[in-house]
Amino acid sequence: FFECTLECDIKKEGKPCKPKGCKCNDKDNKDHKKCSGGWRCKLKLCLKF
């Protein structure tokens, strides 16, 4: 499992990529679960959609 906690906790464009406690492991990535503010965590990276 690839945890992307660090990547998702950092801020981009002044907005947090993901809320605390929002996990983004390999299983979640397959589901392409959205994070707050339209951010998605994919391949251990925070992407804005």
Curated annotation (Swiss-Prot):
InterPro entries: Hwtx-2-like. PROSITE patterns: HWTX_2. One of its GO terms (cellular component) is extracellular region. It is found in: Secreted. GO terms for molecular function: toxin activity. Disulfide bonds join 4-17, 8-41, 22-24, 35-46. Pfam families: Toxin_20. The keyword Secreted applies. Its main location: secreted. Keywords: Disulfide bond, Neurotoxin, Secreted, Toxin. It comes from the Eukaryota. The keyword Coiled coil does not apply. Belongs to the neurotoxin 12 (Hwtx-2) family. 04 (lasiotoxin) subfamily. Toxin that causes irreversible contractile paralysis into adult Aedes aegypti resulting in 100% mortality after 24 hours. This is U1-theraphotoxin-Lp1b. It comes from Lasiodora parahybana.
